Regions:
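Charged, amphipathic alpha-helical coiled-coil/dimerization segments
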Residues: 70-123
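Conserved N-terminal beta-strand and adjoining loop/helix that marks the start
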Residues: 1-16, 31-39
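N-terminal helix-turn-helix DNA-binding core of bacterial DNA-binding proteins
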Residues: 18-64, 69
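Structural signal for well-ordered, non-membrane alpha-helices
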Residues: 17, 21, 103-106, 110, ...
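C-terminal regulatory/oligomerization modules of transcriptional regulators
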Residues: 45-47, 119-137
Length: 137
């Protein structure tokens, strides 16, 4: 019997999170810390802007967010300049190192999946998500 898509989505999500956590642990980064470095690599942001971007990924647990940001500050990876949070020099180096191992991991995860198959899967998931969100209103 085929499992419903929700089963596979939840199973994939849990497996991806576990794999990413293990991958990033080699650099002593949490997934949320990496997400923060990844966002800040694009440009410095105000605390409110950063919160707005990270909320969909992290949820609304303010204490968790504060702890993760405090750890990044404590390790000298992010700094505040002109009321904006930005990567420090060592933060940028850590981001590049993490980006490299995450890319290697992504290649391993998508082994045997063609570019067109991957694009189609993303397209289908996006449309299903939008449909479900519309119907939930």
């Amino acid at each position: 019997m085929n499992k419903p898509i929700g089963y596979w989505i939840k199973r994939l999500d849990a497996a991806l999170e576990g794999h990413l956590d293990a991958t990033l642990a080699r650099l002593r980064l949490s997934r949320r810390q990496w997400q923060t470095l990844n966002v800040l690599a694009e440009s410095p942001l105000s605390p409110g802007q950063l919160e707005g971007i990270l909320n969909p990924l992290w949820g609304s647990d303010k204490r968790l967010r504060e702890n993760e940001l405090a750890a990044l500050v404590g390790h000298g990876l992010i700094i505040m300049i002109d009321d904006r949070i930005t990567l420090s020099e060592s933060g940028h180096a850590k981001y590049l190192e993490a980006q490299r191992i995450v890319e290697e991991s992504r290649k391993d995860l998508s082994m045997g999946i063609g570019i067109d198959e991957y694009a189609m899967a993303l397209s289908v998931l996006e449309r299903m998500t939008l449909n479900a969100e519309r119907l939930a209103r």
